[in-house]
Amino acid sequence: MSGMVRGIRGATYIEKNEADCIIRETKLLLLEIVEKNQIKAEDICSILFTSTSGLNASFPAMAARELGWKYVPMLCSVEIDVPDSLQNCVRVLMHVNTFLKQDQIKHVYLKEAKKLRDDL
């Protein structure tokens, strides 16, 4: 596929700092992003993950690896600890090759993370 490289944002809330919770919720987020935007793994250029400082039981990128996305470059980082911001949150920036226009991209915010972008 060619087209353009576009960024797709997403975030979800993780109830407990446990590896299975982080991986399960991140996997659900990734699956919803690819479904809503009709993306195949080979269309994904890269994924950046951030998590708030209280989530360190697993790398969120493990969720993508469990989905079989072994050729997608990924990076995990800690989100800036802004006072009064949403905690226990994994954020995603997925770069994809797509023919969708910017206003056709469907960003995905789940659970308590919906309040991060209530304009969408």
Residue spans for each PLM region:
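Terminal domain-initiation and capping elements
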Residues: 1-120
